[in-house]
Amino acid sequence: PMSDFAYPLHEECGVFGIYDRAGTEDVAAAAYSALYALQHRGQESCGIAVNDDGVIQGHRDLGLVNEVFTPAVLGSLSTPTAHMATGHVRYATAGSRVRANAQPMIVRHGRGTMALCHNGNLTNALELRRQLENEGAIFHGSSDTEVICYLITRNRLRMGSIETAISKTMDVLEGAYSLVIMSATKLIAVRDPRGYRPLCIGTLPGGGYVFASESCALDAAGATLLRDVEPGEIVIADTKTGELRSIKDHCGRPDTQMCVFEFIYFSRPDSIIEGSSVHEARKQ
């Protein structure tokens, strides 16, 4: 029902992405470990999508990480040729406890496939959704994440790259969003211009990058914290070059403000956010 959509109180979700440049990691297992470390950010549903040589497939369901990802399910996602993965844990109101709202959301379109994970809350989601529905869009769930997916996909069909499509989409999004997006050849982290929800970058010992809501997930995946994604920044790990690059068209807003509850309540004490230990911040 629309009422669920109008008040999607999934403030506290966890997102994760991994690109293993060396090809030595079991990326599905790394995603599982990371989501287990982020379980405190959402207990309603979870999911993992893997990129196996450009082919994206995934599994998502209602339940805790260790319930949804049995050894058999995790095994079906673990292949030696999969070098990228994304994962998500979701927290939401009871009314929208449906599998259609579980993430990562996988979208197949004329230019390829995209898997998207979202932590945050759009303030203009209802307005955007109605606008899209009036133009013929069909939605399967009640989450604002689906609106983001639709907008990026529509822009991608008109534009030269997924990152330009994301930047164009950011022009109309209002509110909080930290995104991890996986295409056939790229893993991308996006943070809203106000930086309301945390998002950090880590490096893998064998080469490659990890994106996560909190640094505790980097630790779980065997990565080292590099830095936070800046408010408004789009960070691209490109498998064709193996390097990180950044688009800062939406950076530089003077009113950046991270949610105070990240330090007080949401985040794990052993995480480091914006250079500060959550544990130390709570003691203060």
For the regions a protein language model found, what residue spans apply to each?
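Conserved short alpha-helical segments that host acidic/polar catalytic motifs at enzyme active sites
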Residues: 1-284
